[in-house]
Amino acid sequence: MAKASTSGASRVRKKVKKNVSDGIAHVHASFNNTIITITDRQGNALSWATSGGAGFKGSRKSTPFAAQVAAETAGRVALEYGIKTLEVRIKGPGPGRESSVRALNALGIKISSIADITPVPHNGCRPPKRRRI
């Protein structure tokens, strides 16, 4: 008969909160959604939020207001880690580009720089066909 072990299985590791003063906010603004990830300088994620995760579904996910709400959500969690300054890197052509940066600024986080890192093809893949309405 196997003996039930009492040590080891019941121990739960306490999550350690890092104290980070500056970090990087990665904003991925696609046409359908906006994803905001706040990392430390090494690239370890501290917090993240999406427009869909903020409660918006369908075409409302792709609005600037949805990106603003998502940025506020990610920013509040990052403030608990002690974030004071952020370097913002924006990727994508979506409508949530500017409003997400404004929302982070309104939380009291100092934005040191804004960089557009949208990948531009050197005539790579064929783009989607034009919409006809």
UniProtKB/Swiss-Prot annotation:
<dbReference type="InterPro" id="IPR019981">
    <property type="entry name" value="Ribosomal_uS11_bac-type"/>
</dbReference>
<dbReference type="GO" id="GO:0019843">
    <property type="term" value="F:rRNA binding"/>
</dbReference>
<dbReference type="GO" id="GO:0006412">
    <property type="term" value="P:translation"/>
</dbReference>
<dbReference type="InterPro" id="IPR001971">
    <property type="entry name" value="Ribosomal_uS11"/>
</dbReference>
<dbReference type="InterPro" id="IPR018102">
    <property type="entry name" value="Ribosomal_uS11_CS"/>
</dbReference>
<keyword id="KW-0694">RNA-binding</keyword>
<comment type="function">
    <text>Located on the platform of the 30S subunit, it bridges several disparate RNA helices of the 16S rRNA. Forms part of the Shine-Dalgarno cleft in the 70S ribosome.</text>
</comment>
<dbReference type="GO" id="GO:0005840">
    <property type="term" value="C:ribosome"/>
</dbReference>
<dbReference type="GO" id="GO:1990904">
    <property type="term" value="C:ribonucleoprotein complex"/>
</dbReference>
<dbReference type="Pfam" id="PF00411">
    <property type="entry name" value="Ribosomal_S11"/>
</dbReference>
<dbReference type="GO" id="GO:0003735">
    <property type="term" value="F:structural constituent of ribosome"/>
</dbReference>
<protein>
    <recommendedName>
        <fullName>Small ribosomal subunit protein uS11</fullName>
    </recommendedName>
</protein>
<keyword id="KW-0687">Ribonucleoprotein</keyword>
<comment type="subunit">
    <text>Part of the 30S ribosomal subunit. Interacts with proteins S7 and S18. Binds to IF-3.</text>
</comment>
<dbReference type="InterPro" id="IPR036967">
    <property type="entry name" value="Ribosomal_uS11_sf"/>
</dbReference>
<keyword id="KW-0699">rRNA-binding</keyword>
<comment type="similarity">
    <text>Belongs to the universal ribosomal protein uS11 family.</text>
</comment>
<keyword id="KW-0689">Ribosomal protein</keyword>
